Swiss-Prot record:
GO biological process: fatty acid biosynthetic process
EC number from the UniProt entry: 6.2.1.20, 6.2.1.47
UniProt signal peptide: none
Family assignment from sequence similarity: Belongs to the ATP-dependent AMP-binding enzyme family.
Domain of life according to the entry: Bacteria
One Gene Ontology molecular-function label: long-chain fatty acid [acyl-carrier-protein] ligase activity
Pathway given in the UniProt record: Siderophore biosynthesis; mycobactin biosynthesis
Keywords: Acetylation, ATP-binding, Ligase, Nucleotide-binding
Name of the molecule in the record: Medium/long-chain-fatty-acid--[acyl-carrier-protein] ligase MbtM
Reactions catalysed, as given in the entry: a long-chain fatty acid + holo-[ACP] + ATP = a long-chain fatty acyl-[ACP] + AMP + diphosphate; a medium-chain fatty acid + holo-[ACP] + ATP = a medium-chain fatty acyl-[ACP] + AMP + diphosphate; hexadecanoate + holo-[ACP] + ATP = hexadecanoyl-[ACP] + AMP + diphosphate; hexadecanoate + ATP + H(+) = hexadecanoyl-AMP + diphosphate
Regulation: Reversibly inactivated by post-translational acetylation by Pat in a cAMP-dependent manner and reactivated by Sir2 deacylase.
Organism (species): Mycolicibacterium smegmatis (strain ATCC 700084 / mc(2)155)
Length: 526
């Protein structure tokens, strides 16, 4: 038993609180005491022990059995890797092949899934053992499972962009994950009376951390599938009302969407909410402030708004404000070749316990005037051991995040990114991976594809693919690009723009000018 499995066991077996899970078909919530969830997790841990798996893959919705599968892997001392399910527009066979290959490539040997996801995965030829989590986790236990030595070194294998924008897997040890959970709990002031409510995907570090915080804290949490929010976004606010949640978390786009259309809301009571984390993507000041103002008529305290900073390499949280501070804004002047302009940026709080932040000065200051801008570097107890397949990160070593920022008395401010990531709905997406996949489509010119994020601070940021194309069937090729990217990357492009050969802007050395492509696309959209 490692420190994380011991903490989970102690909390779940002594807690009187519940895990409350949303059932999409009936649109009802179902309570499961943490003690019962622990028994289900023991069943999963036992099966993993029989398989001898040091790394376990999870695919599916956050059913009680799905949650038990995650916790069971952690109880067994195995590393858990969670991947997205099938998304709209994806080819089922391509998705299943891609998912199983991704698991195999990071050392996963046992997979847990359920329902249609399970059925599709089992149609593919794979050496991985694939279990039905509903079957394994639902079995009755007559004895308490005696946990032996951990089956592996790591607790979480988290997909990430890395500091260079290259797809990587962060390897997180049990002590690092637990340190992050405890540091976050201390900053938030987590108490036994707190109630969480989340629809965040568990394959995202923010969603997984929100769930594990409740499990380790033994507190009540309400967990809905991301698909339930996507199909009816205003459900989130009604879930907060029904649960009397004190804690929630979401990416910027969710706060912007609800705030923009809040006039549609009725019968809402958010007076219990004391901490609403905003993370995973750049913070839109106006949209976030509007959420606080508009929802205050339903009892929401704008002081609960908590823009924060984190990344998978640090388990999740790095800087988080103290509850009650609310949205803090720093106004800056930015100079470019076109002149000067002012921008308002969110202050993201100070480092949680065990973590440190510093700035590494460089040439890239993002044009910010009167601020000491540098690349954000972090270190501390929550840090990963390193990326899979690469040299380990030495304890105490400063890790360059690729983000540009500066420090104020109220905390960290992020003003730009060195790494060319695309952020959609809180997810970091890798341009090179999308471009490689799109280039497989007949007629699309290899090496002449650019994937960019557009309107990143808007309510609905999107992924746009621009490619040079030559062929008779543009419509068919466009559909195939969407299908392939959806299947293998788990995100549906907002648009695919085909251009004549030679149209994409390049540098004198022949490199594609991504920022110029992004600017042209945004201008063309008006």
């Amino acid at each position: 038993m490692n420190v994380l499995s011991a903490a989970l066991t102690e909390a779940m077996t002594t807690s009187s609180a519940d895990l409350v899970v949303f059932e999409p078909e009936t649109r009802t919530w179902h309570r499961h005491p943490w003690g019962q969830v622990h028994l289900r997790a023991q069943n999963v841990a036992e099966r993993i022990g029989q398989d001898g798996s040091s790394a376990v893959g999870i695919v599916g919705e956050p059913t009680v059995e799905g949650v038990a599968a995650i916790l069971g892997a952690l109880l067994a001392g195995s590393a858990v890797s969670i991947l997205p399910g099938l998304v709209r527009g994806a080819d089922p066979d391509q998705w299943a092949d891609s998912t199983l290959n991704r698991f195999a490539n990071i050392g996963v040997t046992t997979v847990f899934s359920h329902g249609s996801y399970l059925e599709q995965l089992r149609t593919r030829d794979s050496s991985l053992v694939i279990h039905d989590d509903a079957e394994v986790a639902h079995a009755q236990r007559s004895t308490t499972l005696e946990l032996g030595a951990p089956l592996g070194e790591f607790a979480v294998l988290q997909g990430t962009a890395g500091s260079t924008g290259t797809p990587r897997t962060a390897q997180l040890r049990p002590d690092a994950v637990l340190a992050n959970l405890r540091g976050l709990a201390e900053r938030v002031g987590l108490a036994g009376s707190d109630i969480g409510c989340s629809w965040l995907p568990l394959y995202h570090d923010m969603g997984l951390t929100f769930l594990l915080s409740a499990a380790v804290g033994g507190t009540e949490t309400w967990q809905a599938p991301t698909t339930a929010f996507a199909s009816a976004p205003f459900s989130w606010v009604h879930w907060l009302t029904e649960s009397r949640a004190t804690l929630t978390a979401a990416p910027n786009m969710a706060y912007g969407l609800i705030g923009k259309y809040s006039r549609r809301l009725t019968d809402v009571d958010l007076s219990a909410m004391r901490f609403a984390l905003n993370g995973g993507e750049p913070v839109d000041i106006d949209g976030t402030a509007r959420f606080g103002t508009e929802l205050s008529r339903f009892g929401f305290d704008p002081g609960a708004l908590s823009p924060s900073y984190g990344l998978a390499e640090s388990s999740c949280a790095v800087t988080v404000p103290v509850p009650g501070v609310g949205l803090k804004v720093d106004e800056i002047t930015v100079t470019t070749e076109a002149g000067s302009s002012t921008q308002k940026l969110a202050v993201l709080g100070h480092a949680i316990a065990g973590m440190e932040v510093r700035l590494q000065p460089g040439d890239e200051d993002a044009g910010v005037v009167d601020r000491e801008v540098g690349e954000v570097e972090i270190r501390g107890t929550s840090m990963m051991s390193g990326y899979r397949g690469e040299a380990p990160l030495d304890p105490g070593e400063w890790f360059p995040t690729g983000d540009l920022g500066y420090l104020t008395d109220d905390g960290l401010v992020i003003c730009g990114r060195k790494k060319e990531l695309i952020t959609v709905a809180g997810r970091n997406i890798f341009p090179t991976e999308i471009e490689r996949i799109a280039a497989r489509v007949k007629g699309v010119r290899e090496g002449a594809v650019v994937a960019v994020g557009t309107n990143e601070r808007a309510v609905r940021p999107g992924l746009v693919i621009a490619a040079e194309f030559r062929g008779p069937d543009e419509a068919g090729a466009r559909s195939e690009v969407v299908q392939r990217v959806a299947s293998e990357c788990g995100v549906v492009p907002a648009d695919v723009v085909f251009l004549a050969p030679g149209s994409l802007p390049r540098t004198s050395s022949g490199k594609l000018r991504r920022l110029e492509v992004k600017r042209q696309l945004e201008e063309s959209k008006g």
